[in-house]
């Protein structure tokens, strides 16, 4: 039942984002103690938590629903081929990759951008925590609000919020005097953009997983949902790669310059980075709108021919 599927996806998002929030509380205190080495040691912490979680699942989790479990590698390979030869699912994965490329900038661009532009006292860990906090607070409400709308419609709303979020992030470097005393405009507008980005995630993620699960043959829902996260693989590769190129071009490392004035001249257009991601988000949003129109037209023709 669709309502049950939505409830499951909301529960998944809540747990993922609670973990995302608590995990990020470590990085800023660690950075205050050991400096840049924190970005190395945080990976050890993440690895340890992952191993503990894996052992907990192996030892404690027992499913009462065994349909679709225990598949061989050959069956998994066949399932993968079914998905990549299903043009609807493949195109949807590629489109949603555009959203996640922008979302990945919480980790790829934002930390270095904020520290370089707002100063060493900036707290990128807490800034990034705005995302999971907003998702946990609003995902249930938004999913219920859009319950009578199709999954694609809900996703479209979120997709068109994404370019707006990137433009808000760019505004931090365009404003004059600080709007809020004690908080740089870079930080303020980054938080504003992340709030909008998190709301977009509330519209997109649960309904994306719902759409994927509805396309799966009975007993293969788990495998299809697993492959639905191919967007994470693609968005990480392309999102982090592009972030490195854009940071080098528009917001380079200050230690590479002899004077602060030379660095300021090199980073005067640092906000251009967010224009690129606004464009990616807008292209993805338009692509999803076209996808919805085309698939709806095809489905109507099939219904009429029956």
Which residues does each PLM region occupy?
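C-terminal ends and interior cores of transmembrane alpha-helices
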Residues: 160-182
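Helix-to-loop junctions at the C-terminal end of transmembrane segments
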Residues: 31, 137-157
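Single conserved hydrophobic/aromatic residue that forms the stacking wall/gate
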Residues: 1-8, 12
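Hydrophobic core of transmembrane alpha-helices in multi-pass small-molecule transporters
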Residues: 180-204
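Extracytoplasmic gate region of multi-pass secondary transporters
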Residues: 23, 87-125
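Loop-to-transmembrane helix entry
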Residues: 41, 115-134, 157, 188-191, ...
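Juxtamembrane intracellular "pre-TM" segments in multi-pass secondary transporters
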Residues: 65-92
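Symmetry-related core transmembrane helices of the 12-TM Major Facilitator Superfamily/SLC fold
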Residues: 40-59, 267-290
């Amino acid at each position: 039942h669709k309502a049950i599927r939505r409830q499951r996806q909301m529960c998944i998002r809540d747990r993922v984002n609670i973990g995302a929030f608590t995990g990020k509380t470590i990085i800023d205190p660690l950075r205050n103690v050991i400096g840049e080495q924190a970005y190395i040691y945080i990976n050890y912490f993440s690895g340890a938590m992952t191993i503990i979680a894996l052992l907990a699942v192996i030892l404690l989790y027992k499913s009462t629903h065994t349909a679709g479990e225990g598949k061989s590698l050959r069956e998994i390979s066949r399932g993968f081929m079914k998905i990549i030869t299903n043009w609807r699912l493949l195109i949807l994965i590629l489109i949603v990759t555009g959203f996640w490329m922008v979302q990945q900038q919480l980790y790829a661009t934002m930390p270095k951008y904020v520290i370089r532009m707002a100063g060493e006292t900036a707290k990128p860990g807490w800034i990034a925590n705005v995302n999971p906090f907003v998702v946990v607070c609003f995902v249930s409400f938004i999913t219920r609000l859009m319950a009578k709308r199709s999954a694609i419609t809900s996703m479209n709303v979120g997709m068109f919020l994404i370019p707006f979020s990137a433009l808000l992030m760019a505004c931090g470097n365009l404003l004059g005097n600080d709007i809020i005393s004690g908080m740089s405009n870079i930080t303020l507008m980054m938080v504003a953009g992340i709030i909008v980005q998190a709301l977009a995630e509330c519209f997109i993620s649960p309904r994306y997983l719902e759409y994927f699960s509805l396309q799966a043959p009975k007993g293969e829902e788990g495998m299809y949902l697993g492959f639905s996260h191919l967007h994470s693989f693609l968005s990480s590769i392309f999102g982090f790669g592009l972030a490195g190129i854009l940071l080098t071009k528009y917001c380079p490392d200050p230690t590479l310059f002899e004077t602060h004035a030379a660095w300021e001249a090199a980073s005067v257009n640092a906000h251009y980075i967010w224009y690129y991601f606004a464009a990616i988000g807008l292209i993805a949003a338009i692509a999803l709108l076209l996808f919805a129109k085309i698939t709806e037209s095809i489905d109507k023709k099939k219904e009429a021919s029956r």
